[in-house]
Amino acid sequence: MISLPRFKHPWDQILLVLILLTIIIVNFSPATWLIGWDNLMPEFNIWMNLKRSFFAVWQEYQGLGLVGGMGHATDLIRQLILLPFTLILPNSLIRYLWHFAMLFLGTFGIYFGLKKLFCRTDQACLIPTIASLFYLLNFGTIQYFWVPLESFSTFWGFFPWLIFSLWDYLNCVWNRHACSLQLKKLIFLNILAIPSFYVQTIFLVYLACIFLIIFAFLIRTGQACLPSTIKIVILIFLINSFWLLPFGYFLKTNLTNPVAGIGNFMSSDESFDRNLRRGYISDFLLLRGYYFDFPDTHATFMAPWGIHFSNNFNLAAGYLLSLFVLIGIVYSIYKIKKPIHLSLLLILSLVSLALLSATPPFSFINQFIRQNPLLNQVFRAPFTKFIVPAIFVFSIFTAYGLQTLVTLATRLKYSQKIFTLILVSGYLFLISIFSFPVFRGQLFYSLNKQSVPKQYFQMFDYFRQQSPTARIANLPQGSFWGWTSYRFGIVGSGFIWYDIEQPILDRAFDAWNLKNEQYYWELTTALQSRDPLLLSRILSKYSIEFVLFDDNIFFPSEKIYSKTALSTKDFLSQVPGLSLEKQFDKISIYRFHQPTKPYLISSPPILNAQTFFYTDFAFIDHPDYLTSPSAKINYPFLNLFTNRLQSEIPLDIKINNQQIQIGSTNFPLNDSLNQTKNHSPLISNTQQLVQTNDDPPLQFIRLTNIDSSNLIAWNFPDAAFENSYLLRVIYRHHQGLPLTISATSENLNYKFFYTRLDQKPGWQTAWFIIPRFENYNYGTGINVIFNNTSLSYRTSQNDIQSVDLYPLDYYPLASTQLPQYSKTLQNRQYLDEKSSIFFHKIKISSPPLPNSYLVLPQTFSPDWLAFYF
């Protein structure tokens, strides 16, 4: 092996430290929090969050309570590491501290790992330094830290240490003493790296890399290392068992929830299409992923980097850097008989399969794998899962590429020192040009560096004085996406639950429990219809004790929800049983007269179970009902709900002989609204009117897009908001993404629904309920809007044959009960309790009435057990 020049002092390490310190200094903003997007912030209340992580299987604070669907327990390790720092440092520094520490850890992980391969003494050499700089400054790393998530940055920081320590362990199986030391080191590193697996799919990626490395060593060294490989696999599972077992319980009992959630249903195909746009070799060589194109409110998500790469010289620097990677790949192919090189090439194949999703033959394999709905859901955004192994192997290949060029120059009789000086200087110049925005403060998204107003800490202090089980409804509410924008700058999935112990009914938790999502559908119906009594019933049904209205929240891209927020604030004072309790600047806290406490009910009515609905008419008629397949009371039309998937509609809907047939019930057909409908003008290059030669001829509008989107809308100007309607759409999906469809009022007061049409072949008919949101005739005009979108270079093509709107008296239909029973009254007997996450001790002072039931507000999950003694 040809060694590059060495120095008497560790100037290379000093150089790395200086570069890292420079990056930290220019990217740290004093008096701000690193907050927003997706974030884990236990430092707000470290002791409370430690308890949550320790008892992670049940997430009581998430809405109605749910079985943890993320690797919540994994963050326990990180929280224990952070604990002493939270006691001595301002909490606003903690996230900066962790992510900057991971930058140091990952950079020096590459450095020390490669130093063993390329340097025979403890003196410095240049190859590890150059490769470490690549690991730090490549564009994959920049994207990974742009909106830093603790799981991602931890994986980035520990991955080099994990892989190099595994290589060391497998290389020393013939030396028992050395092997024992390496095993202890490997166990220690695997324990520290556990926070990486908060996003569990990263654990799957890590396991895949481990198995590929083990396979490479077994192929090249034979059976000698088999016992050691079995031992390390068992140890990895044992080390991670404390969070894998709770997650296994989630998979057993709640797997369908994240797959069926409306947010995941709407975003899975779209997320993969975004990844597909960057699934080409030209992007792979730059490690450029879908973050680069991600939209923001006013510009692209990574606008500073987009401007930087608009200069072809900067882009060329990146491709020149990739030449070293390609040379290293060729070198590893030449050395493929060595297990390390074989394992590198196997990991390269894995990340190529994931990231080259638009490049044959990897695209064909991708399409085959994604026929499985679960795998398609889990790996809908492969970039964030596979980019770290890609960065790692690219860094190692860079080192081998440098070594190969130096070796070649030496054999060609060039001066090694002069050639090395030119080569290293050129590389440093290229990587400096390529990554220059990092040194101008562009490591983190600028909107993620914000101050948190004092009013939030006042609110946190207030809730510390309240019952920890008191459920909170947070308002205003917008769409189902669970993405919140604050007027003072924070944008993301939310943060207040990191310092509020009470359960919060936020949209961020809907994906893990469909009961949370059902609450949202009822809530948005009540808010848009401005019905105080209906909202009061929702608060009662879901045992909500507090309503938190935060006027700092706004909806920059949804004017309809902005209007709803204004009206919500006005009518909260009219909600029966709800009174203003506390005001902290723009944050208003209301208390409902019914507490979040266990209670007894006697002889409750038993109804048939429902799935999704707009309004729970069963609860209006029979508060605190039970559900059973053998129920005597049935609401056959209650779950005639169309805001989600067409396949979930429980009743067949048809039009026959001038009648609307829903199930076996007929309703008169009124076609008058369709006489005055109109649609927006066609855009010539993407929207085409097609007429077939059939008899009779078939006419439809074809929408075609490549890496673009366009809208087409049907307007029904005479549709009054005081009525409910049934919408029929006849459409056909050809290829790419299916159509999204939404219905709004022309005056932008109401958004009736927003969903995605099916991808079934052939002509399909979709039905949608548009419920009445007004009891008075103040406005008319309904728009039905279709969006044909392609987020990649793949064609999206869909046809629309007809869009028709018919009046339908929906509310009397949905409230129909069979047989007809008189309404019942609510008869709750509230009880005192002592609670501790898994355990609720409830004292019943007097013998309960016959046929009494104990209701625990957490019983929206079926997994609780009650014992009476």
Show where each model-derived region lies.
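Hydrophobic, aromatic-rich transmembrane alpha-helices
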Residues: I214, L238, T297-W305, A317-L353, ...
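Extracytoplasmic
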Residues: F265, G426-A508, I844
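Membrane-helix boundary/interfacial segments in multi-pass membrane proteins
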Residues: F44-N45, G140-F155, A260-S267, M302-A316, ...
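Membrane-interface coil-to-helix junctions
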Residues: I19-T107, L133-W156, M266-F309, T359-L375, ...
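Active-site-proximal, structured, solvent-exposed surfaces of multi-pass membrane proteins
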Residues: I2-L4, L651-S664, F700, S708-N715, ...
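Periplasmic/ER-lumenal interhelical loops and adjacent helix-loop junctions
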Residues: N49-G65, G71, F242-G328, F383, ...
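Membrane-embedded helix bundles of polyisoprenyl
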Residues: I23, L103-L117, A124-C172, S180-L218, ...
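Extracytoplasmic/lumenal acceptor-recognition loop(s) of multi-pass membrane glycoenzymes
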Residues: R52, A358-F362, S467-Y542, I553-F555, ...
